[in-house]
A protein has these predicted regions:
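Long, charged/polar, surface-exposed segments that mediate recognition or autoinhibition
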Residues: 30-92
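An acidic-aromatic pocket/loop used at catalytic or ligand-binding sites
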Residues: 3, 10-32, 96-147
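A sequence-composition feature that detects small, non-aromatic residues
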Residues: 5-6, 48, 91, 125
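Non-catalytic effector/regulatory segments
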Residues: 1-15, 72, 80, 92-93
């Protein structure tokens, strides 16, 4: 079947990155997979790989699964102390959406694991996301975007 995509723009409206949403197979742990690369990059260098698991209206179950993933990653990144944050999601102006995030800051990128419980007005699926991001893409998101 056909893959979908989304364009990430900077604050000036310039297209910077493209996100490709991949089809998944039922046996995979992650229900949603996506890759991100720069617009017009002829080498298609991947700047992010994301996997998602849906937890509709179940923030506690999501946080329990997130805790398992974080423990697994702590066993991989033994010298990196993760940063944790919980609060309102910037993408929701109503303030109803919340997220619980853990970050592993690497020398050349970030691993970001988070649960989101979206407010009623937001048309997104609640759930867990695990994202491996290049430093370039991490900086773009911090500078230009609400994620």
């Amino acid at each position: 079947s056909e893959n979908n995509s989304s364009i990430m723009k900077d604050k000036k409206g310039k297209e910077r990155f493209i996100i490709i949403f991949l089809d998944t197979i039922p046996s995979q742990e992650y229900e949603d997979l996506q890759i991100t690369y720069k617009i017009n990059d002829k080498n298609y260098i991947i700047h992010a790989i994301d996997g998602g698991i849906n937890f509709p209206d179940d923030f506690e179950k999501c946080k329990n699964k997130k805790k398992e993933v974080v423990i697994d990653l702590e066993n991989v990144f033994t010298k990196i102390k993760p940063r944790n944050f919980e609060g309102k999601h910037n993408a929701d102006e109503s303030g109803e959406s919340i997220h619980n995030s853990t970050y592993f800051d690497l020398s050349d990128g970030t691993v970001h694991i988070w649960c989101t419980l979206w407010g009623d007005k937001m048309n997104y699926a609640d759930g867990l996301t695990v994202s491996l991001r290049s430093k370039n893409y991490t900086n773009f998101l911090q500078r230009e975007n609400s994620y």
